[in-house]
Amino acid sequence: MAYPRSKRFAYKSWKSKSVICLFLICLLPVPTFSWSAQLTVRMAQPSTSLGWLSLYAARANGYFADEGIALELIIVQGGADIAAIISGSVDFDVTSTGGLLRAFSGGTDLLGVYNILGKCIYDLAIRKDTAQRLGITPAMPVPERLKRIKGTVIGAGSGIGVIPYQVAYFLVKEAGLEPGKDVTILAAGGGDSALVALRTGHIDIMSYPPPFPQIAIKNGDAISLVANTKGEYSPLNNFQSSVLVVRPEYAKKNHDTVSRVVGAMARASRWVAENDAKEVAKVVAKFFKNAPPDVLLSTVELIKPAVIPDGRMSLDGLKGVEEAYRVNGVVKKPVPWDHLVTNEFLPQ
């Protein structure tokens, strides 16, 4: 279509101004709408406990958001977190090193990409009246205490697949007793449920991570039977409790995503290690509203030394878990740790 000269000039003038305006707009700062740019990842967590201190710190301090990650956290109890990661229902799983071993023993290789905790944090607390009846006192050596628990019922996590159960099973066998015959080990659910079961006498002993054994002791319902958080039983002192795992094929296809999630965890672990326990407890307190402040603080003080600031895997710690699971009959073949864990995704 032919335009009159004046209209052609007006059109060109408008077009030129539009280009200039567009150029100037491009020079303006672009607002950061982090919510729209973030990548959503699904992560399983097998329990609510301070054993996942670095994860709670990362969430509270916004480290996942800083990495461009929108974290969708799903609590999956009873060892079902391993099934969730294997099936692809979740992308990541914060789990026990034992979970990695159980998957391997079942013929499935998962990949550990971050060392969450480098020591055993599963404590056993025994009812006061049961301890008195069996003649168990805190002054006794741990092996002597354990030899006296014949006939008791231990509540240990949410099922045979979880590490509190396996730690209890290992300690019973170390005492020369037979699980299922001399001592009953059963699932008691989450920590709050176990506290009720202990208080009402449905179980004699609880095997749980902090803060639950500490709460039972604080409430006057129990005394300590084995304080692994304090290194009371030396065979469990080299024990890498928990790891962040992914499916190997997911890690291969999503290297950047795994690196960002690991980066958030590493930043949180450094923050936990570098800050005072009071500050750490204050920050994560919103996740543990039912825990008395003094118990929460003392529990953080117990957990802090187990947090690995750089998240690097420890072969000695991994083999410590392997040995316990071998004694329990879960692991029967050599474990190729160089194939099951990696430090590849750690911040450089």
Model-derived features: positions:
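Conserved C-terminal helix/tail region of periplasmic/extracytoplasmic solute-binding proteins
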Residues: 322-348
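Bacterial N-terminal signal peptides
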Residues: 19-31
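Secondary-structure end/capping motifs
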Residues: 252-330
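Short, solvent-exposed loop/beta-turn-alpha elements that line the ligand-binding surface or hinge
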Residues: 66, 131-137, 231-237, 304-314
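Small-molecule pocket liners
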Residues: 53, 118-124, 128-130, 222-223, ...
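Pocket-lining segment of extracytoplasmic ligand-binding domains
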Residues: 193-286
